[in-house]
Amino acid sequence: MMSTITGCLQEGVIERMKYTLDYQKYAELARRVAAEGSVLLRNEENTLPLRRGQRVSVFGRTQFEHYKSGTGSGGMVNAPYVTNIIDSLKEDGIIQVNEALEQVYREWLKEHPFDVGEGWAMEPWNQEEMPVDEELAVQAAGQSDAAIVVIGRTAGEDKDNSAAEGSYLLTALEEELLRNVCHAFEHTIVVLNVGNIIDMKWVDRYQPQAVLYIWQGGQEGGRACVDVLTGRVNPSGKLSDTIAEDIEDYPSTENFGDPVENFYTEDIYVGYRYFETFAKDKVKYPFGFGLSYTKFQTEILGFSVQGTAVTAIAKVTNVGGVSGRETVQLYLEAPQGKLGKPLRQLAAFAKTEELKPGETEELLLKTELTEYASYDDSGVTGHKSCYVLEEGDYIFYAGTDVRSAAEAGKATLTEPRVVRMVTEAMAPVQEFKRLKPFFFEEKDHAIANWEDVPLRTIDLADRILKERPTKSEYAGDRGWKLADVLDGKIALEQFLTQLSDEDLICMTRGEGMCSPKVTPGTAAAFGGVTEGLKRFGIPIACCSDGPSGIRMDCGTMAYALPNGTLLACTFDPELVEELYEMEGMELRKNKIDTLLGPGINIHRNPLNGRNFEYFSEDPYLTGTMAAAQLTGMGKYGVTGTIKHFACNNQEFKRHDANSIVSERALREIYLRGFEIAVKQGGAYSIMSTYGPVNGLWTAGNYDLLTTILRKEWGYQGIVMTDWWAKMNEEGEPGSGRQTIPMVRAQNDIYMVVADAASNSAGDNTAEGLADGRLTRAQLTRNAENICGFLLRSVAMERLLDREEEECTELHNPISTEGAGDSGQVLARLELPEPKLLEDIELPLEKLSTKKGTSAVYQLRFPKIGRYELVFRMSSTLGELAQLPISVFLNNTLQQTVTLNGTEGQILERVVTLPIRQDGEKYMKLYFGESGIDMHRMFLRYAGQNDIESFRNE
């Protein structure tokens, strides 16, 4: 355990919390996680681990430029350092690096620097590779015992992968590199520094002796990789996705990437559910597969069924020569019945501690049969809109991957059993067909059959009208504060009667990005964002991206953590929970109430750009890992916002592409991970997606956010939109102004607007209240959800000064001042005696707006007062691009402004600079993302105001 916590929550007061944020232990834990999530796919001739003193040549430019994460909001963590592979190998000292080859690369890199791209979603998937001809490969082989080839890839938000060279496929130069190195060396190790799986046909072509996926391991990823290569850590990661022979073998590929409609014709047969049922011969590496440097023997000691509770006991023995860990996986084969089922579903898993040679451990694998009831969306079982266990044998298989799992036992039902009765929700309205298995008796796999997908039969508008609350009276200000609710003096319902309609409307708006009301550089502020709301003692909560660590666009640094795919490959929720305890401490230290993560969308297709953020193709593994993160963060009073609810399985045209999917597939696959996170992880903050599902944008989808989430699952928490999302009335196009369906659906907060009080985004909530499309009671219901979140947040304690907290920091490499490098002084200007609102131009000749750069202006201010720094700028990027600029005076952050992509239109942004003392100041600009074209920048004097109060600010 890496922290000491004392204190308790009593009568709404945290008496004292003491904790130690030891950054060295944080790094050690992140490094361990990154190593344990690495997956060894091939290890011929015991090529790995490398032996002490071995001479090794390292190829591939990514050895120098480690990908810590993917791109976009999930990857924009300002890490204090990122370890790479080559330096970590030399730091480790176990093997001898071919320094002559290293120098060849370093000289080449001087002429071929890292290409950061043109800005948001414009980063290249890969970097240009140094050509390696036969002569260089043979020369290096003569000086070495083994070769390591490092291949790197990235992708991310707004930028899917592509079934093209340099993305899912290798480039011609990478093919040449592998061909020449594998031919010249007796032992070649390929290391894949990638966010998600890539095409693996090259393994057959070049036959490298070892292949290791290290994913994107955060800032400690380089060291973690070396730990595995040298055997300090025995790899124990297991694939969280199936690797097929070809991208076309995935059933979703046919419909992936359409800009308008994406039909989920594969239905519930995603990943291994499809391959184990229909196409076993198309699998190159099965789900759950991963090698070790040792060997294990697994046997089932016991299997029992009591009611619907299923228990298996597995005995694992290390029969090899080195210490290691093993994961036992329990799979279910349900009877086909009338609905049709996949031949395998992951039902449970457990991982051993580190076992020395000869040691044994017994693992307990438990599950509930009811968790794997099938949803009948057609009524074919006689139980429409019910979760049903059909009669027959439920056979369980145990093993170390889905393909090798052997029968462990079975449960038999002699008649169908209805597990849960619900109500039809989110059924599609467009006709299409879905996959269903058909079996010949003599075959162990199905052939594809197709059936019509059941369409919606309920009147959604009528449901919304009948269920809408109508009673909510305005009582005026009674003098109550939200603290009175916390202390049990009044009910929350009473408290909310004081809020005017305008107050309630304002509470539905989050402010950002980079609101000055909360931690600098974060994603949004929400809650008491107006003076009217603050008057009632409503605190302002802070949220920040994201799944790979804390993003603060002002340049403040934070720990960059291993990506979601890697975390899932550990198959170790306890270890992930421990890591996210540390993340919880870091969030609390930075006064951030919720992290915008984990991302828990399903890996429907390997080409989704944000797969690096997400966990797996399997919903049970996904939900289990999400619950572990939430539990870890929750130990420090903070939480995560699980996202994107739901079906964010494609980045291309994600704002508008309609996901058309059956109700059964939604419930069994795409919503299931969220359900586990809510019920087992205690989630109380959720983010909806950008796009529509079955014609309704999720940000205003009543059946998603009320019928299923709140009524069926019993969810008590907030829902927020994704940033600048659209909503719609059924049959109408989506619009960011259309907040009426958002409020009606209990999506509580629109993210984000510049100013909640003035309705700067021009939403139509007030219009809907005036004409009866909304009721005050609906707004009150949303306010109750928001206040419920705030009442359990540390933001509430901060507002009341009840948070007595003692944080000790050890071994801190992180600068809290932010803004990257110190920056180049571009100009030294003595400003003229200012005239009110007169423009004072700042030169742009040497200004660089590339990601991570800083620019400094040395300015002499002749008088105190308020000055306005005005940017006139544009970007050719799309409207969802996020391009932050942070402005510092004498290294003190003044404000961070965010420009969205303008598609070439010139816009103006203004930052107020309070000059409390005349004289010389250093004004620094920090650009957090590339893509801004600066057309003009100037200062103007805005007056002194009340000088005495101004001096005391």
Stretches found by the model and what they are:
Residues M1-S404, R420-E868, P884-E929, R936-E953:
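Glycoside hydrolase catalytic-domain context in secreted enzymes
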Residues N318, S875-L877:
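Extracellular acidic, Ser/Thr/Pro-rich low-complexity tracts
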Residues L413-E415:
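Interdomain boundary/hinge segments at the C-termini of tandem beta-sandwich modules
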Residues R872:
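N-terminal beta1-alpha1-beta2 submodule of the flavodoxin-like/Rossmannoid cofactor-binding fold
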